[in-house]
Amino acid sequence: MDIFILALAILPVIVLLIYIYKQDKYEKEPVRMLALAFLLGILSIPLTLFLDGVIDVMIGGTSVFYVAFFQAGIPEEFAKWVLFMLVIWRNKNFDEFFDGIVYMSFIGLGFACVENIMYVFGEQELLSSL
């Protein structure tokens, strides 16, 4: 049963990764770089949790707006963007406008894959801060 649930959590990510890869019609990105981008999405989670803690200490709040915007949106997207800028931005393979969509999608899907797994296996405490 756990394998089936895990597959349900990961399958949408795999489908989207393949779809996005196929959309890059002119100059496909190296699979190694795409795997790195996916890994960066996974690695953005600790940075997200750190940023969430900093924002919570600095601002604090419990409203739906606060949680959605300051505890989820800003830390998550900023963490993904920072890793993109540090690792992918200056890479020689990043040479077309569409590459930004491809790489950021892979980063986002790396994050989403872990988030999906955490949702289906009930890691509520950690999830509440993502």
Positions of PLM-derived features:
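Hydrophobic alpha-helical segments at protein termini of multi-pass membrane proteins
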Residues: M1-L130
